[in-house]
Swiss-Prot record:
Originating gene: guaA
Catalytic activity: XMP + L-glutamine + ATP + H2O = GMP + L-glutamate + AMP + diphosphate + 2 H(+)
A Pfam family recorded for this sequence: GATase
Keyword field: ATP-binding, Glutamine amidotransferase, GMP biosynthesis, Ligase, Nucleotide-binding, Purine biosynthesis
Origin superkingdom: Bacteria
Source species of the chain: Serratia proteamaculans (strain 568)
Subunit structure as annotated in this protein's UniProt entry: Homodimer.
PROSITE patterns, per the entry: GATASE_TYPE_1 (PS51273), GMPS_ATP_PPASE (PS51553)
Protein name: GMP synthase [glutamine-hydrolyzing]
Active site: C86 (nucleophile), H181, E183
Amino acid sequence: MTKNIHKHRILILDFGSQYTQLVARRVREIGVYCELWAWDVSEEQIREFNPSGIILSGGPESTTEANSPRAPEYVFTAGVPVLGVCYGMQTMAMQLGGQVEGSNEREFGYAQVEITTESALVRDIEDALSPAGKPLLDVWMSHGDKVTAIPADFVTVASTDTCPFAIMANEEKRFYGVQFHPEVTHTRQGQRMLERFVLDICQCEALWTPATIIEDAVERIRQQVGEDHVILGLSGGVDSSVTAMLLHRAIGKRLTCVFVDNGLLRLNEAEQVLEMFGDHFGLNIVHVAAEDRFLSALAGVDEPEAKRKIIGRVFVELFDEEACKQSEVKWLAQGTIYPDVIESAASATGKAHVIKSHHNVGGLPKEMKLGLVEPLKELFKDEVRKIGLELGLPYDMLFRHPFPGPGLGVRVLGEVKKEYCDLLRRADAIFIEELHKADLYNKVSQAFTVFLPVRSVGVMGDGRKYDWVVSLRAVETIDFMTAHWAHLPYDFLGRVSNRIINEVNGISRVVYDISGKPPATIEWE
């Protein structure tokens, strides 16, 4: 029997901060399981979850507004440690009898806080010492309102010149508030503070590791499916690949992977997926060669959202056809990860807006009557990659740049044709190959090539040619919510351009996209 890796757990209540998922990832990195819930949960739900500690996230609202979010009262009577971060500190202070006021001085960015009182939260933690010998911390602030009076049973632990209560604490009740963001890397000792809270104050044991996650997932898969057979749509992407490896470890040949080659993959990608998972790892793979079917369905369609929906629909039809041939199959596996679960919950409550539709086997017909197996649904993407490494998947595959679900269908602008896809595949392969050779691939967050359905005059030898244009795109980003275009060296771009024009017959011009996000999106469609 494996250890219960969920035994010690932290509950994070989300007040809307852009950093809230980062808080959860930091807690997981410490080795402790946590979940992220909306702030307005019931006492019954908290009791049922039985957390070892609670973190109140930051948020964009003002606690001085009458209808602003508040922590459930039970948070402060549950008898477990509580850490309030930014807005979380402000609502803690206000709900426990302190005062919060709006401020004309919005504090955003780097700040240095001076620790004036000892606290379990910052014990033996410092970045420097003040002239008076007091510990100093380099932190990241992002707030307008600030606490102007702390609750009666709290003490001031640290302050800045403009923020008198940068850290407050009630050591007896184990309540702590920080006006900065310990989860961001700009707060240099932030991870150590979170470790103090999670491991020392909440007394959690670090049981959440790649090896124990795999052991737990394998056991749970076996308990869920018993002796039944499972089917999985394998794309070769990170999530479906790790899902396949977990299921293979748990149930072996009772897993059938359906790999649909839609003709919209990268150069040699289909062959690589089949070789790795079929020949090397020994998985049972059904290969569906469906390029003609996808391209026929896409003929004459140039609107991006329509293309996405067609690609998703045809995939579902093909997968359904293959699943119906597998009479023993009782379960459908999906590579759903924790951010998908969070996003779905937000959509269900009307708190999210779909900018681009996602195509997934979640749209499979109800008449298939298959149970659902989602072994990654508790995991963030970085955790999925870590367990992928532990399972023996190659680093280059797990840390490859993101590739859209519809593939080249949204990187060929306008109508998708086989000729365009073939040209784009070869041009993109050259770009990626040169990025690796120049040691630039891992220095950018995402890089790819886009096919533009416009012709441009070129000169080749003594003759002229009238051929297609491609655009190179490379961006740097932390969270893919915002992005800067990558300032790649001119000589590198020149080398890539020359190779594409000389080696890919049919392309006469290469341009480089220098648009940031916003206003542009990272993908062109």
